[in-house]
From Swiss-Prot:
HAMAP family: SHMT. It catalyses: (6R)-5,10-methylene-5,6,7,8-tetrahydrofolate + glycine + H2O = (6S)-5,6,7,8-tetrahydrofolate + L-serine. The modification N6-(pyridoxal phosphate)lysine is found at residue 230. This is Serine hydroxymethyltransferase 1. It holds the Pfam family SHMT. Pathway: One-carbon metabolism; tetrahydrofolate interconversion; Amino-acid biosynthesis; glycine biosynthesis; glycine from L-serine: step 1/1. It comes from Burkholderia thailandensis (strain ATCC 700388 / DSM 13276 / CCUG 48851 / CIP 106301 / E264). One of its GO terms (biological process) is tetrahydrofolate interconversion. Its EC number is 2.1.2.1. It is found in: Cytoplasm. Belongs to the SHMT family. Keywords: Amino-acid biosynthesis, Cytoplasm, One-carbon metabolism, Pyridoxal phosphate, Transferase.
Length: 415
């Protein structure tokens, strides 16, 4: 039926093939500093592009609504067993198609519309799914938000007071733009004191946690959700880890609650990524991620930029650009012209609009994957500062772009 020699993307759909090739070139020739992006291994991509994409498998291993699932059962069980071993979890669901759907699955399992939840404010580094009014979490539930204190660390005392005042049914921990270590044990004590569930969204920190270089929330939380890409370096998808007593409720919430047939090719890719993350090499990689982030942040500070919270203790940092009189939007564009990819991001109490912002978010996972070390991280920090000091100077942009080209040639991703 299918002629492998002829059924290539290039032959079947030249337009898509061209876009893919252009994106391949961009990934090779640009320095990727978006904190939520990374490069998956060829093995992960091969699993995701396998024949498993053809198989419907509604249900769970050993209990499917379709025949012919004996081999995908093996795949899903391996993914479950590996992610449990990776994080020390009692139970796991590997079917969520995204981190947002993983969060939604917990909400659907444990809450009713109108219940009160408490999460970190999006304006202070939280995530849309932690109660933002534009997200379903903010529309379905009564939301109380906690944020940062004057030192730009999480205000645990204020969170404690809010929890006792509002008695939320569920407290959400985790962030999308927060550089310090989160005290999950302290938040668990707050939740226990008010009779709330604790859900930790560790999407940004999962790879660091797997390697033991960032605090593990699993011993303290009722539920832990995550994406499988970002610092974990797997395919795009989600996972829910939970205490064994909640496994049946969570499984029912995912299927048939909010999803139908699982994406078995993606679950296979998750399993491969989990196996990679269980290796000693992955721990070494994450240690380098932390070191590169520290060097990058220190370099930017030396060049007159302010890092929100004063430092980074993880892979991510939020850079306040106001000292350079440039917005996040303009900085993103200028750095993009120099082939350095970042994303504009609001800083705490940002006076600018969300699509403009006063900051950019930077992360070290992708550049570390391609082999950058502290020396390269320092150089990247100086290149960023050069662009931000002269964002409209063509000569500066051209010089930085040439230095980026030299770096990316010396440290290829897939070539």
């Amino acid at each position: 039926m299918f002629d492998r020699a002829q059924s290539t993307i290039a032959n079947v759909d030249p337009e898509i093939w061209q876009a893919i090739q252009q994106e391949n070139v961009r990934q090779e020739e640009h320095i990727e500093l978006i904190a939520s992006e990374n490069y998956t291994s060829p093995a992960v991509m091969a699993a995701q592009g396998s024949q498993l994409t053809n198989k419907y498998a509604e249900g769970y291993p050993g209990k499917r609504y379709y025949g012919g699932c004996e081999y995908v059962d093996i795949v899903e069980q391996l993914a479950i067993d590996r992610v449990k071993a990776l994080f020390g979890s009692e139970a796991a669901n590997v079917q969520p198609n995204s981190g947002s759907q993983a969060n939604q699955g917990v909400f659907f399992a444990m809450l009713k519309p109108g219940d009160t939840i408490m999460g970190m404010s999006l304006a202070h580094g939280g995530h849309l799914t932690h109660g933002s009014p534009v997200n379903m979490s903010g529309k379905w539930f009564n939301v109380v938000s906690y944020g940062l204190n004057e030192n730009e660390d999480i205000d645990y005392e204020a969170a404690d007071k809010l929890a006792h005042e509002h008695k939320p049914k569920l407290i959400v921990a985790g962030a999308s733009a927060f550089a310090l270590k989160i005290d999950f044990e302290r938040l668990a004590k707050i939740a226990k004191a008010v009779g709330a569930y604790l859900m930790v969204d560790m999407a940004h920190y999962a790879g660091l946690i797997a390697a033991g270089v960032y605090p593990n929330p699993v011993p303290h939380a009722d539920f832990v959700t995550t994406t499988t890409h970002k610092s974990l370096r797997g395919p795009r998808g989600g996972v829910i880890l939970m205490k064994a007593e909640y496994e049946k409720q969570i499984n029912s919430a995912i299927f048939p609650g909010i999803q139908g047939g699982p994406l078995m090719h993606v679950i296979a890719a998750k399993a491969v990524a989990f196996k990679e993350a269980l290796s000693p090499e992955f721990k070494e990689y994450q240690q380098k991620v932390i070191e590169n982030a520290r060097v990058l942040a220190e370099t930017l500070v030396k060049r007159g930029l302010r890092i929100v919270s004063g430092r980074t203790e993880s892979h991510v940092m939020l850079v306040d650009l106001r000292a350079k009189n440039i917005t996040g939007k303009a900085a993103e564009a200028a750095l993009g012209n120099a082939h350095i990819t970042v994303n504009k991001n609001a800083i705490p109490n940002d006076p600018e609009k969300p699509f403009v912002t006063s900051g950019v978010r930077l992360g070290s996972p992708a550049m570390t994957t391609r082999g950058f070390g502290p020396q390269e991280a320092e150089l990247v920090g100086n290149l960023i500062a050069d662009v931000l000091e002269h964002p409209e100077d063509a000569a500066t942009i051209e010089r930085v772009r040439a230095q980026v080209a030299d770096l990316t040639k010396r440290f290829p991703v897939y070539r």
